[in-house]
From Swiss-Prot:
Keyword Iron: no
Gene behind this protein: rplU
Subunit description: Part of the 50S ribosomal subunit. Contacts protein L20.
Protein name per the record: Large ribosomal subunit protein bL21
Cellular component terms per the entry's GO annotation: cytoplasm; ribonucleoprotein complex; ribosome
Species of provenance: Beijerinckia indica subsp. indica (strain ATCC 9039 / DSM 1715 / NCIMB 8712)
């Protein structure tokens, strides 16, 4: 059985025991999280599609790690002006292990 959930403005297709990387969620490693925004359930019989969400369906998970993504460099230069700017950015991320899908 798999589900499509929405968190952090993005959609993720998940199944039990998957580890997904999502935008930062509050909590420490080992804490339980519940995703209520379930868009689709499939795998057993007819697939269920929400409009926009499926009432009563949840996906539970456990925070594995709070981490940061790779460094992204932003570089701007104005030609012939001896003017340039270099900035770096690392996005905060959370690794979540999916423990169950509750229809």
């Amino acid at each position: 059985m798999f589900a499509v959930i929405k968190t952090g403005g993005k959609q993720y297709s998940v199944a039990a025991d998957d580890i997904i990387t999502v935008m930062t969620l509050q909590g420490e490693p080992g804490d339980a999280v519940t995703f209520d925004s379930v868009l689709m359930l499939a795998g057993e019989g007819e697939p269920k599609i929400g409009a926009p969400f499926i009432a009563g369906a949840t996906v539970s998970g456990e925070i594995v790690e709070q981490t940061r993504g790779p460094k992204v460099i932003s570089f701007k230069k104005r030609r012939r002006q001896n003017s340039k700017r270099k900035r770096g950015h690392r996005q905060d991320l959370t690794l979540v292990k999916i423990t169950g899908i509750n229809a």
